Amino acid sequence: MSAFGGPGGGQINQKPIPPQRGSFPLDHDGECKHVMTSYLACMKKVRGVNDNECREFAKSYLACRMDHNLMARDEFKNLGFQDVKDSSNKGDPAKKGELRW
């Protein structure tokens, strides 16, 4: 039996769910374009790896959007930017070629 024409085969109406953080306006005036292009160039340079340098560009981009009222102001820790501290590198810094446990 076909689901298209059979009884009870009508579409189920579901209420659309809004995005978690709401919607925000696009940057039509290019107020943060310079930061965005720097971020995209960084991502291209590191071939898509989540590099700390690129994360700083992303953080700057979000700060620019918040400064120009293109998104709601929020703390960076809520946007996924937390102070990343590697627990394996405690104490003095490692020397090149040194194996650390």
Curated annotation (Swiss-Prot):
It is found in: Cytoplasm; Mitochondrion intermembrane space. GO terms for biological process: mitochondrial cytochrome c oxidase assembly. Signal peptide: none annotated. It comes from the Eukaryota. Required for the assembly of mitochondrial cytochrome c oxidase. PANTHER family: CYTOCHROME C OXIDASE ASSEMBLY PROTEIN COX19. This is Cytochrome c oxidase assembly protein COX19. It comes from Pyricularia oryzae (strain Y34). The gene is COX19.
